[in-house]
Amino acid sequence: RSHWAQSQAHKDNKINYSGCGHTRLHCRYTTKQRTPQMQYLCTANSTNTKTGNVPSIWIGATRKESIQSCVDVGCPLLHKKAGGQGGGDNNLCYAQHGTPKMAHATMCKSAANGKDYSLSNAILHGSRAAKMVRVGAIGDPAALSPIDSAYIRQTIKRAGLSLVGYTHGWMMKTARHWRGSLMASCDTLEQADQAIAHGWRAAVVLPYDHTERKITTPDGHTVIVCPAILQPEIVTCNNCRLCDASIPGPVIGFPDHGPGRARKLQNQKVTK
């Protein structure tokens, strides 16, 4: 992996792939210099205790661009003020409206000043213990161009790593090339059944107070709660990788952990 990453990093730094977010220069336009194209930034390491220390891909080279990726796929977890349905009594995106947005804002400034956030560089300098790349630490990967999407999949595969990521854009025709790579992010068990029927593996948001470890969808598909949530002291995404959509598996359930979860729990205690 190290030899390949060094070779690929050298190529990325020498070649200007116009319009592709995987270059060192992060070109913003297509070869015709007309259509703005969604970019992405890649980091080698992570302090996220749930995922483990793995390379990560952040969608958007600006905060506005990242939020736009969520608007483009119609993500309901985006705050109402930003064009989604989140906030109030509805679930709210942890990444775009929690602490990850601050880290992303810092990265955007560094990228504008020339810091190398290419995927090859992230893989080259990633931990040797990393077994996966997290695709979509913020933003939605389905908003990326087909060319960038193919590059990401091929680069991760050639590095011998698993790809783990999610998209709310699974119902879009333009996201079909991500089937078998990304998990379909679903908001209900019924949606999970729909995603599976269309060839996706599914992940689903569960109520914030969900306690059961295993349930079934209306169509009878098994749903298990994310092992890294159940046993955070011993399980990380890096050593679990059940969300590698290239491998058959159950629906993965995630109890709501958005910014409003603490308030909901407090309200629940008050009403008891």
Q: How would you label these PLM feature ranges?
A:
Residues 7-11, 23:
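Intrinsically disordered, low-complexity segments enriched in serine/proline and basic residues
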Residues 11-16, 32:
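Intrinsically disordered, low-complexity polyampholyte segments enriched for Lys and acidic residues
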Residues 21-22, 35:
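Intrinsic disorder/low-complexity segments enriched in small, polar and charged residues
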Residues 29-272:
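Class I S-adenosyl-L-methionine
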